[in-house]
């Protein structure tokens, strides 16, 4: 059924002009300043560093292990680990935002980020 069908009147159709398809629940409005900064840093890394290497790797059917060193230098690995142990001491919302930005470019690298941060680094810290 569509909005042009007889079951819907024009006045009853939702206004999708104001709908934000990238943030339908407007969750970005709930983020704290430090979470926004971490998200923006991760997005910048994903666009400027990760994307070109993913495109190049896809063409050559290769994985670029150097990306992990670069993620580490950016502080994207183990961000929930306290600063005194080498992490950023960020919350899990920030961790999710970083994962979302990396996932936006490539799910394989996001999986590797998650394994390194959650299954390797966190158990060593804990």
Q: What is each PLM-predicted segment?
A:
Residues 1-34:
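Intrinsic disorder at enzyme termini
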Residues 9-11, 26, 39, 53, ...:
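Context-gated lysine
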Residues 29-50:
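Mature N-terminal segment immediately following signal peptide/propeptide cleavage
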Residues 44, 49-126:
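Glycine-rich flavin
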């Amino acid at each position: 059924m569509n909005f042009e069908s007889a079951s819907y009147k024009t006045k009853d159709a939702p206004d999708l002009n104001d709908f934000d398809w990238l943030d339908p629940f407007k969750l970005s409005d709930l983020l704290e300043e430090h979470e926004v900064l971490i998200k923006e840093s991760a997005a910048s890394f994903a666009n400027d560093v990760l994307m070109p290497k993913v495109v190049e790797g896809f063409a050559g059917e290769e994985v670029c292990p150097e990306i992990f060193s670069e993620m580490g230098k950016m502080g994207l690995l183990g961000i929930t680990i306290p600063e005194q142990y080498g992490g950023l001491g960020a919350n899990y919302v920030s961790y999710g935002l970083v994962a979302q930005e990396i996932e936006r470019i490539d799910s394989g690298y996001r999986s590797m980020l998650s394994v390194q941060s959650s299954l390797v680094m966190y158990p060593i810290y804990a």
